[in-house]
Amino acid sequence: LKCHKLVPPFWKTCPEGKNLCYKMYMVSTLTVPVKRGCIDVCPKNSALVKYVCCNTNKCN
């Protein structure tokens, strides 16, 4: 699986076991991702942070 780094078009190949790409947003600025990368389990959203996860190449 290949996931984008914080600034596309840069990307990295995910290590074994991290089979999701994710984007993390602050709820106050939903248009600007704060973090991107590979993750094993999609974290739960909170009052301040929203996560978007997906399992195809460079989908984040």
Curated annotation (Swiss-Prot):
It comes from the Eukaryota. Keywords: Cardiotoxin, Cytolysis, Disulfide bond, Membrane, Secreted, Target cell membrane, Target membrane, Toxin. GO terms for biological process: killing of cells of another organism. GO terms for molecular function: toxin activity. CDD domains: TFP_snake_toxin. Disulfide bonds join C3-C21, C14-C38, C42-C53, C54-C59. GO terms for cellular component: extracellular region; membrane; other organism cell membrane. Transmembrane segments: none annotated. Expressed by the venom gland. Coiled coil: none annotated. Its main location: secreted. It holds the Pfam family Toxin_cobra-type. It is found in: Secreted; Target cell membrane. Belongs to the three-finger toxin family. Short-chain subfamily. Type IA cytotoxin sub-subfamily. Monomer in solution; Homodimer and oligomer in the presence of negatively charged lipids forming a pore with a size ranging between 20 and 30 Angstroms. Shows cytolytic activity on many different cells by forming pore in lipid membranes. In vivo, increases heart rate or kills the animal by cardiac arrest. In addition, it binds to heparin with high affinity, interacts with Kv channel-interacting protein 1 (KCNIP1) in a calcium-independent manner, and binds to integrin alpha-V/beta-3 (ITGAV/ITGB3) with moderate affinity. This is Cytotoxin 8.
